[in-house]
């Protein structure tokens, strides 16, 4: 059993090293944002949930990225329940859907991803000591196929993928006021990237 456990541990370690190296190379100027989660405060009476929680590696992914890129941690409270448009607390619906009484229905994972991104930008502004941060966009050739706007696609990370990144940079600075104004500031399609908690997928969201 010990032999198989060590083999599994080494495979996980190798995968995380390749994943973090790939992310840091594909996005060399990026700031990676993670929720500041404490695994030990998340255990409950559900043994299956606790078993799956033990196998998650998000903290290890974040720590590995710290050696290769800039990593920030944000408050995880209500990231999946705060409306990305008006900021009010939303009601949970069945499955991966949340509802705002004012703004309508959203995908829960998209909402979480957007709010983590928003809090990360606000934190970066404080750390940089300015009223805004430079905005930079990236276009990736032949890395991901085009998907309809607003749709979610799960992609298994490939450690052998290489991509050219023609980056269009803007020196404009901005103040984050509300998500509607924020999205319109960008002169390129806003894409938010997040790593699944189990480290198995790279989630890509196209903000409409």
From Swiss-Prot:
Highest taxon, organism lineage: Archaea
Record-level Gene Ontology MF annotations: DNA binding; metal ion binding
Binding annotation for Zn(2+): 83, 86, 100, 103
Transmembrane segments: none
A single GO BP: transposition
Classification via InterPro entries: Cas12f1-like_TNB
Keywords in alphabetical order: DNA recombination, DNA-binding, Metal-binding, Transposable element, Transposition, Zinc
Entry keyword Metal-binding: yes
Parts forming coiled coils: none
Family per record: Belongs to the transposase 35 family.
Name this protein carries in UniProt: TnpB-like protein MJ0012
Native species: Methanocaldococcus jannaschii (strain ATCC 43067 / DSM 2661 / JAL-1 / JCM 10045 / NBRC 100440) (Methanococcus jannaschii)
